[in-house]
């Protein structure tokens, strides 16, 4: 069982926000891409996105295009989007369905969906050429609770070891079985770290999110993960209908076999470095973050529901989606304003309050990951 402490107990006095360079420097951004995004396990979506053999998505990670595809054998694999002949990019559409092969549009080198080279015109005329020597370059891939993760590192930390702190933690929410009801994409003119720091505290909620603050008091927060790459805990839902929706009522059946206390809580966790996970009694929301520059972040947000909810009378996914779309946009707006202010020569790191202890803990995890001392 997890042990929760009040959010203020996770606070370490004296810590300040990060210096300006961490939000505006292209050099720091480059370090982040190489030391963090090219070395860590990153969420790239849901297994259900790749429902049939040949289904694929492209993801750009640390400047690299990666194909994530379901093979004819049903297994999901990831490969660099690079032909082994002369380096041509193989796929350009962000998602789609391939036939039984991937063919390079330049000289027609052809690969099976497991990356094996099976066609290379005229290469039989090259002495010693062996197609077995030229498979697509693989990218490490792992599945967890219905989510897919990739890692560009040559020798990545084993996924089970990296995610050990989360093993079984969310099993009661039946994450692997949940079904997507909506996905929304956002382009935010702010540094990716501001998004994480904002997610990690609700001190701003009464001012920025009056609708949210009416349904869950910002002082109700307790945390069970408050140091390291995974951080978070819960807040109490006080809405009479027991849900964070526009109506305040549940928009569908419970996502799992939840204890009584879970039916009145929303759990918020950040999974370093690119995932935010929000677990409600009647739905689960997750964000993935994709930094594009020191001041630009692409964010996807997806809402998951119990599979039996679809088609049921009274199922109202838009009640949740609209609530959080409004809340998301409030967050993105204030993060963009923070980005503008931090870019000023007048900016100096300010002190964190006891209500921002998880944001400060996230900063510590970030500094460790990039190899900088705090």
Q: Which ranges hold each PLM region?
A:
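Soluble FAD-dependent oxygen oxidases
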Residues: 32, 64-66, 373
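C-terminal catalytic domain of Rieske-type non-heme iron oxygenases
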Residues: 75, 81, 142, 147-374
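Rieske [2Fe-2S] iron-sulfur-binding domain
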Residues: 49-154, 158-168
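General detector of N-terminal leader/presequence modules that precede the first folded domain
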Residues: 1-8, 322
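Non-catalytic accessory segments flanking enzyme active sites
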Residues: 18, 22-61
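Short, contiguous pre-domain boundary segments
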Residues: 6-20, 176
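Non-catalytic, topology-defining segments of multipass membrane proteins
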Residues: 1-4, 15-16, 179, 372-373
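Short Pro/Gly-enriched beta-strand edge/turn motifs at strand-loop
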Residues: 39-51, 120-124, 269-273
């Amino acid at each position: 069982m997890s042990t929760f402490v009040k959010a203020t107990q996770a606070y370490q006095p004296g810590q300040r926000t990060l210096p300006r360079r961490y939000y505006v420097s292209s050099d720091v951004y480059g370090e982040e891409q190489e030391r963090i995004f090219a070395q860590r396990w990153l969420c790239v979506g849901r297994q259900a996105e790749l429902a049939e053999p040949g289904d694929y998505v492209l993801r750009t990670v640390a400047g690299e295009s990666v194909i994530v595809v379901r093979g004819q054998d049903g297994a999901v694999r990831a490969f660099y989007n690079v032909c082994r002949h002369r380096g041509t990019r193989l796929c350009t559409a962000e998602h789609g369905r391939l036939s039984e092969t991937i063919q390079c549009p330049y000289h027609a080198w052809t690969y099976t969906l497991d990356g094996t080279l099976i066609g290379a015109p005229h290469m039989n005329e090259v002495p010693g050429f062996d197609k077995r020597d030229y498979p697509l370059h693989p990218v490490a891939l792992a599945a967890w609770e219905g989510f897919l993760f990739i890692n560009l590192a040559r020798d990545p930390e084993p996924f089970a070891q990296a995610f050990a702190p989360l093993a079984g933690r969310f099993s009661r929410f039946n994450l692997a079985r949940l079904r997507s009801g909506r996905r929304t994409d956002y382009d935010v003119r702010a540094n990716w770290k501001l998004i994480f720091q904002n997610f990690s505290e609700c001190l701003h909620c009464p001012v920025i999110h009056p609708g949210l603050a009416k349904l869950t008091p910002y002082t109700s927060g307790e945390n069970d993960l408050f140091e390291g790459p995974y951080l978070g805990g819960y807040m109490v839902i006080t809405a009479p209908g027991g849900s964070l929706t526009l109506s305040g009522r549940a928009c569908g059946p419970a996502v799992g076999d939840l204890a009584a206390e879970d039916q009145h809580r929303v759990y918020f966790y950040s999974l370093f470095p690119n995932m935010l996970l929000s677990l409600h009694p009647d739905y689960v929301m997750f964000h993935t973050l994709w930094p594009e520059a020191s001041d630009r972040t692409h964010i996807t947000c997806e809402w998951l529901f119990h599979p039996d909810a679809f088609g049921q009378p009274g199922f109202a996914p838009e009640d949740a989606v609209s609530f959080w779309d409004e809340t998301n946009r409030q967050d993105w707006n204030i993060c963009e304003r923070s980005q503008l202010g931090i870019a000023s020569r007048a900016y100096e790191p300010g002190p964190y309050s006891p209500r921002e202890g998880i944001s400060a803990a996230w900063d510590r995890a970030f500094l460790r990951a990039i190899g900088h001392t705090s």
